[in-house]
Regions:
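Glycine-rich phosphate-binding loop of actin/hexokinase-like ATP-binding domains
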Residues: 4-62
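ATP-binding/phosphotransfer module of carbohydrate and carboxylate kinases, centering on a glycine-rich
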Residues: 3-9, 50-181
Length: 181
């Protein structure tokens, strides 16, 4: 998103990418922040509340693997999720439950990240149909509305602009960005 995104580019943002697991990146002062070992912004392991009130990791709630697991448990095939991103065949109750869980997890991750870093924006993207990305973004904003953000500057929550190819493009851009940006 930092290199290939379109439109207004915030200087400080957290990027979430839905793939097999949820991943991401942290951009500070207009530059990718890799951290000491290169894993900064790896949002998947962030602790978030689960539906049972216990602590889960974000990737346990907000990943395509979780959606596939839910589909298989309900007797639905998830094979097509991995083959193409334009249209998914998922029953509405399963899709709604997955989006709600993902949005709730994202909201808590955004709150935690915002408490540490003054983020201008959070961008949500991934290997999924555009309508589902739109709905995840909308429900994440609604979940943030329900959290106590006292003392924390709430970032804008927006959709990413690169889409399903962001993971591959981002990986290809890292050496270029390190050398030239």
């Amino acid at each position: 998103e930092l290199v290939f995104g379109t439109g207004e580019k915030p200087k400080d943002f957290l990027y979430f990418y839905f793939g097999t697991f949820i991943g991401g990146g942290l951009v500070l002062n207009g530059r990718l922040f890799p951290g000491r070992t290169g894993n900064a912004g790896g949002v998947g392991p962030m602790p978030v509340p689960g539906p049972d009130g216990g602590t889960r990791r974000l990737f346990d709630l907000a990943s395509m693997s979780r959606l596939a697991e839910m589909m298989e448990e309900a007797g639905e095939s998830s094979d097509h999720l991995w083959q193409q991103h334009r249209a998914w065949e998922v029953s509405r109750p399963i899709l709604d439950a997955w989006i709600d869980g993902a949005a709730q997890g994202l909201a808590y991750a955004i709150l935690s990240a915002s408490a540490l870093t003054e983020l201008e924006a959070v961008l949500i993207d991934g290997w999924m149909p555009a309508a589902i990305r739109t709905e995840i973004t909308r429900r994440t904003e609604a979940a943030l509305d329900r959290l106590d953000m006292s003392g924390v500057e709430r970032p804008q929550v927006r959709q990413g602009t690169v889409g399903p190819d962001a993971r591959a493009l981002g990986a290809a851009a890292i050496p270029l960005a390190q050398r030239y940006l």
